């Protein structure tokens, strides 16, 4: 099943787009992405809440190891995959590859935390003290307004 093997982020994005319905306006498609991200993120948050705050705990794989209410890690992983799907199609709708999104994010984090994350660096972030990140984004504001 080599056609399902993912070697690079852009490879994943290309395969994920096979199931994306890109009909309608850009605004409508982005709304679909945002609602999908919200829904899938909510499912991850609910699983974590039940595992930690309701005392269900996590179980490896699908096996609950004596606790029938334990949250299977594989179920959480599936939801994280759904989030990745919506990030992928959202990036596509805005004209970006997943590779570009990943690079923009890594550059942002490197500028925000040049010495790595620390509580002090988080409190005194350099990227919010008048410095710009120097990242280059595509301007889709006109495209979004047209659709």
Stretch-by-stretch model annotation:
Residues 1-80, 84-147:
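Flexible "arm" and connector segments at domain edges
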């Amino acid at each position: 099943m080599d056609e399902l093997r993912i070697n690079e982020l852009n490879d994943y994005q290309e395969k994920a787009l096979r199931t994306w319905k890109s009909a309608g306006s850009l605004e409508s498609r982005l709304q679909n992405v945002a609602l999908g991200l919200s829904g899938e993120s909510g499912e991850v948050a609910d699983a974590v809440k039940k595992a930690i705050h309701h005392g269900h705990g996590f179980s490896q794989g699908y096996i609950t190891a004596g606790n029938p209410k334990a949250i299977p890690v594989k179920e959480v992983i599936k939801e994280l995959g759904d989030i990745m799907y919506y990030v992928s199609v959202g990036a596509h709708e805005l004209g970006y590859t997943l590779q570009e999104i990943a690079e923009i994010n890594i550059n942002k984090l490197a500028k925000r935390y040049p010495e790595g994350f620390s509580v002090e660096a988080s409190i005194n972030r350099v990227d919010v003290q008048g410095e710009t990140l120097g990242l280059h984004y595509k301007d889709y504001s006109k495209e979004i307004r047209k659709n």
